[in-house]
Amino acid sequence: MGVMGLAHALYLRGHAFASPEAVEFNDEAMEAIAYYAYEASADLAAERGTYSSYKGSKWDRGLLPQDTIDLLEKERGVAVDVPRGGKMDWTPLRAKIAKQGMRNSNCLAIAPTATISNITATSPCIEPTYKNLFVKSNLSGEFIVLNPFLVKDLKARGLWDQDMIDNLKYFDGELKDIERIPADLKAKYLTAFDIDAKWILDAAARRQKWIDQAQSVNLWIKTPDLKTLSHMYRHAWHVGLKTTYYLRSLGAVSYTH
């Protein structure tokens, strides 16, 4: 099982991607997904038996993914900077797994979902919004598509008019130079290249403690440099991430535009 639509969920909850509230939501949502996925696998094990190499596994030894942070910390000899614990009572599920075992060796992995998220009209996996404005092409030609959540919020504030449409087109969907847009909406609709990677990594670390496999975590930097990359990847290591995926950057032409 994976995840997609995180950015849209945050819009609906009114949280900026780069915010403590968003980090907490990642933690709580992933905990709930993990709990019920692992419970379903334990129920399947009671019905059909455990997977072939279950004996001696971490599941068999009573270790859930969140428990392995302490193992990682002990192996490294350095603190893993991620809060332990969660909102749910895992005691009944631990007892169920101890009694019934697990049908699946791995239950959760967050894939990129770039294609299927388009089909289902939601945001890809756990990524921030890439752009608030983009151009789609079909047999009839090209047409502009705006972030529908942004449009809804602008209408609710009485800011949706032809001047706003023209400004959004002129600034390619970027909000920071449009004076009429309030600061809270600018924060809420920051796009991937304007979000500090620390927020992406902290949210990923909160998800990772519940995930038994791994996740596709892309990072965005407009103009990478050695110092920034060093700090970014060291932070990823300190918060216990298993992996990161692509590092996205802007070409010189895109950046100056």
Task: Give residue ranges: language-model regions.
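Internal maturation/activation junctions in enzymes
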Residues: 1, 15-113, 216, 232
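Core structural elements
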Residues: 1-13
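Glycine-centered flexibility motif
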Residues: 2-5, 49, 125, 173
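A generic alpha-helix surface/boundary motif
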Residues: 4-6, 39, 148-149
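Catalytic alpha/beta core of large soluble enzyme barrels
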Residues: 83-87, 96-254
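Residue-level detector of conserved catalytic or cofactor/ligand-binding positions
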Residues: 257
